[in-house]
């Protein structure tokens, strides 16, 4: 609240910064405070830059597009595959745009090898007996409330109608030890999975780390974003 913020930071702010300008509906606007004290500010895409600049006209905002290092995050089997079919892709990642020119069966063959590795590991950690022939959905990231890992269970009847016998889901991710909300989400997923026993196979893999993250992302058929 505004009153609490005044007690905490009064005397620490520059004289030309008017505290009331950072208050909206008696709630302190942390974003504006952060922008004021930042040397530079950026969005994560060109569109994000435009939206943020329209919202905060007094602050110059640029953009740095989110992305990944294509070599680091690609499964080793696909690196070898693209070395054969897209020569030069390592130094010129735009060549990956030509992936649709590679016959699909060849791509599926490599993917299925990665999928078998994932399913083998998952089955070594669970008694659910996941099937490598079934569409596999993956969701693996830090268990924070805003990431909404449990959103897929919002309509259980619809999920059951769509997924019974047709899909299986692999979850993974850790919550901060003091993040009670994050731990509650993990608990919610595990409990929800039990309600689908015998209908849809759902597992939550423990001890999430970079190795497991790579195994899941390279092995699932569909990556779930919420």
In which residue ranges do the predicted regions lie?
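Catalytic cores of carbohydrate-active enzymes across secretory and cytosolic contexts
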Residues: 1-226
